[in-house]
């Protein structure tokens, strides 16, 4: 890879995310990174509610991270003395905030996966790991909380291999564990780092103690073998029995990490500031710069031509808006990642997703909750823009006047739970509308709907905690007092057999009439396949300009199914014939014909109700296992398997969301508070007939 002069600075850039299970110590790790990079003067403890990254009030109270804050920090490599810019995206570890993780994965080049050494790989860590796989993000793993009771570095390494199916490459080994955790051994450089003060700022570097020599030599051999597997030059040396140099080993591990074939594993205790500087060195050593990840691609309007945007400040502008936030002082902030080109304040950009030209106001580089104004953001940088009115999550921003291209967007999951919300007073009514609209702009997995007939407002989201926090923000940020109903399940509707319909809309009432006529074939698709519309009209029986309106009519009718009024999903609609009238046909008439046709097809197609099914994992002491399984079975659960972890059992099951309300309380009483569980949305499945009938009676 040849690097031009204008790209040189990018070799010293790292855009990383810190991703983990709730409570694995992710925010604390981020905090410590900011402390050691000189960005924070005093340390905030998450469990005391004062962390720098967790800056929304609810996050401080709950000690969990909700919104991914983007922060710019600087690090001087301990060994080489070279300076690096590290942009950190702090991602939430709670499953209800998966969209935040998805968004950050889109804009990262690498990630640090943080694990709790006493717990190994937990369910949410698995979800985050899979998301990183999907977006092709290279990772290093950090076995945190090595000072905690029950901490085991080997547990984390084995879990990465067994539960995640990845190849761990431990580049460190802990000296001691739990209360005796006193340092780490760097296997690459064969040095022991002993922590000599509480802040972890003083480190004594020396030789590997004799009692660890056998273990560390064996691990170094395994590390060289793993690196040789991904680097041919090293493989030749290895086969000839030669020892690689330190530089060769680092280069090979770097190559394997960037290719996502191996995952370096480090250890430490962020809370006690142990191992964080070495983690920063590893971020620099093994995670890619913006030049080492595949260039982002943009698709042109024809849907086929693809343009690559290499990371170069002198190239054409290509940026992705990955988060919208309402800021009390400056208004709407649009967080962007610049992939190519340079964004300057005061310039105009073209929002290709919305087909709008927008003016860039001021540009900010963000620290956890302070900011620095800049005149430009260059390729590889992350920052926030003030002044963009229309940009939303996942929108593509390109140069004003450039050809319209769309960068690959962000997968937005559909909400699975909804509840009714109403303002307490007349004065709250208007504020509630504004507040909900702003919150929905920030969070695309949060949907707001108003029933046309009853005027009832419902909000939908990814889980109970998600909606609880949004209602809480409505109260704090928009001063709206609201009553909320009990949570309801977001059902869907579909058809179970293929049908054909002939739908004609004709109206004659003096003067020009209305005429639209379409023949539709509607067929069921696999669960989760979404919606496909196909035009199979031949010979112009329906002119091209009426196909779009007919499709629009179909899509509008899909918003409300015949059984419970929930959206219709997983169908393919083919328009294969129809007719038109030279004078009376209009876009409106075809839209109505399309809409009527779909409604008729769903009625005829043996409609069914679909319900969200959650993947549930319960960790319980052995003696309560029977009760836990019995309870899950009584909730229409399907047990997927069990696995022993220490002296506890992990029960995995698929359970319909409608059966999981109030589960936390029931489970606590059945296990005397000793079990814990996590649940994530997994898939939609058909509701059994007897239950579907009950739902329709309600």
From Swiss-Prot:
Family annotation (InterPro entries): EFG_II, EFG_III, EFG_III/V, EFG_IV, EFG_V, EFG_V-like, EFTu-like_2, G_TR_CS
Keyword annotations: Cytoplasm, Elongation factor, GTP-binding, Nucleotide-binding, Protein biosynthesis
Biological processes annotated in GO: ribosome disassembly
Gene3D superfamilies xrefs: 3.30.230.10, 3.30.70.240, Elongation Factor G (Translational Gtpase), domain 3, P-loop containing nucleotide triphosphate hydrolases, Translation factors
Gene Ontology cellular component terms for the protein in this record: cytoplasm
Pfam family, one: EFG_C
Ranges of residues in domain tr-type G: 11-291
Superkingdom of origin organism: Bacteria
Protein family: Belongs to the TRAFAC class translation factor GTPase superfamily. Classic translation factor GTPase family. EF-G/EF-2 subfamily.
Family matches, as NCBIfam families: EF-G, PRK12740.1-3, PRK12740.1-5, small_GTP
Cited function: Catalyzes the GTP-dependent ribosomal translocation step during translation elongation. During this step, the ribosome changes from the pre-translocational (PRE) to the post-translocational (POST) state as the newly formed A-site-bound peptidyl-tRNA and P-site-bound deacylated tRNA move to the P and E sites, respectively. Catalyzes the coordinated movement of the two tRNA molecules, the mRNA and conformational changes in the ribosome.
Name of this chain's protein: Elongation factor G
Lineage: Bacteria, Thermotogati, Deinococcota, Deinococci, Deinococcales
Gene: fusA
């Amino acid at each position: 890879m040849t690097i031009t002069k204008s790209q040189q600075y990018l070799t010293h850039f790292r855009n990383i995310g810190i991703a983990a299970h709730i409570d694995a110590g992710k925010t604390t790790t981020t905090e410590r990174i900011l402390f050691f990079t000189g960005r924070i003067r005093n340390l905030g403890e998450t469990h005391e509610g004062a962390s720098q990254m967790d800056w929304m009030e609810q996050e401080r109270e709950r000690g969990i991270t909700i919104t991914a804050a983007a922060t710019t920090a600087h690090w001087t490599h301990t060994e080489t003395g070279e300076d690096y810019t590290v942009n950190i995206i702090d991602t939430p570890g709670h499953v209800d905030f998966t969209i935040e993780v998805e968004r950050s994965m889109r804009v990262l080049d690498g990630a640090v996966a943080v694990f709790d050494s006493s717990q190994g790989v937990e369910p949410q860590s698995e979800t985050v790991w899979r998301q990183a796989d999907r977006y092709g993000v290279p990772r290093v793993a950090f076995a945190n909380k090595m000072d905690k009771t029950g901490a085991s570095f080997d547990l984390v390494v084995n879990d990465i291999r067994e539960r995640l199916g990845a190849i761990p490459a431990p580049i460190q080994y802990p000296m001691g564990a739990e209360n005796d955790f006193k340092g780490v051994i760097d296997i690459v450089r064969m040095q022991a780092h002993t922590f000599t003060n509480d802040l972890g700022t003083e480190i004594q570097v020396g030789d590997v103690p004799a009692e660890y020599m056998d273990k560390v030599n064996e691990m170094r051999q395994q590390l060289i073998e793993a690196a040789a597997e991904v680097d041919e030059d090293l493989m030749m040396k290895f086969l000839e029995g030669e020892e690689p140099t330190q530089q060769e080993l680092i280069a090979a591990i770097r190559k394997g990490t960037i290719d996502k074939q191996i995952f370096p594993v480090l250890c430490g205790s962020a809370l006690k500031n142990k191992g964080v500087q070495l983690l920063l060195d590893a971020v620099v050593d093994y995670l890619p710069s913006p030049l080492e990840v595949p260039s982002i691609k943009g698709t042109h309007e024809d849907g086929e031509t693809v343009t690559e945007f290499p990371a170069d400040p002198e190239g054409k502008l290509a940026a992705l808006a990955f988060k919208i936030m309402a800021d009390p002082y400056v208004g709407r902030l649009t967080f962007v990642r610049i992939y190519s080109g340079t964004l300057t304040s005061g310039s105009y950009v073209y929002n290709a997703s919305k087909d709008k030209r927008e003016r860039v106001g001021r540009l900010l580089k963000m620290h956890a909750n302070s900011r620095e104004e800049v005149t430009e953001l260059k390729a590889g940088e992350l920052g926030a823009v003030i002044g963009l009115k229309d940009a939303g999550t996942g929108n593509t921003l390109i140069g004003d006047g450039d050809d319209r291209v769309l960068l690959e967007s962000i997968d937005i999951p559909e909400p699975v739970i909804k509840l009714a919300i109403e303002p307490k007073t007349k004065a709250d009514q208007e504020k509630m509308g504004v507040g909900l609209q702003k919150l929905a702009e920030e969070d695309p997995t949060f949907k707001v709907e108003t029933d046309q007939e009853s005027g009832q407002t419902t909000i939908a989201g990814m889980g109970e905690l998600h909606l609880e926090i949004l209602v809480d923000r409505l109260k704090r940020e928009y001063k709206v007092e609201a009553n909320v109903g009990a949570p309801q399940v977001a059902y869907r509707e579909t058809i179970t057999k293929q049908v054909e319909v002939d739908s004609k809309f004709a109206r004659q009432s003096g003067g020009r009439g209305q005429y639209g006529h379409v023949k539709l074939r509607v067929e069921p698709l696999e669960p989760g396949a979404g919606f496909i519309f196909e035009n199979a009209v031949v010979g112009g029986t329906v002119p091209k300009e009426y196909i779009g309106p007919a499709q629009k009519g179909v899509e509008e009718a899909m918003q409300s199914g015949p059984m419970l009024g929930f959206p219709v999903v997983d169908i393919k609609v083919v328009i294969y014939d129809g007719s038109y009238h030279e004078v009376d046909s209009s876009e409106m008439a075809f839209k109505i014909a399309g809409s009527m046709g779909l409604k008729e097809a769903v009625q005829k197609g043996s409609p069914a109700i679909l319900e969200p099914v959650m993947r549930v994992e319960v960790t319980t002491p052995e003696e309560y296992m029977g009760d836990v399984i019995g309870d899950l079975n009584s909730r229409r659960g399907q047990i997927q398997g069990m696995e022993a972890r220490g002296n506890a059992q992990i029960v995995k099951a698929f359970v319909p969301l409608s059966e999981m309300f109030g589960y936390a309380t029931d489970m606590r009483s059945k296990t005397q508070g000793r079990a814990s569980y996590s649940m994530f949305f997994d898939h939609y499945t058909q509701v059994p007939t007897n239950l579907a009938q009950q739902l329709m009676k309600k």
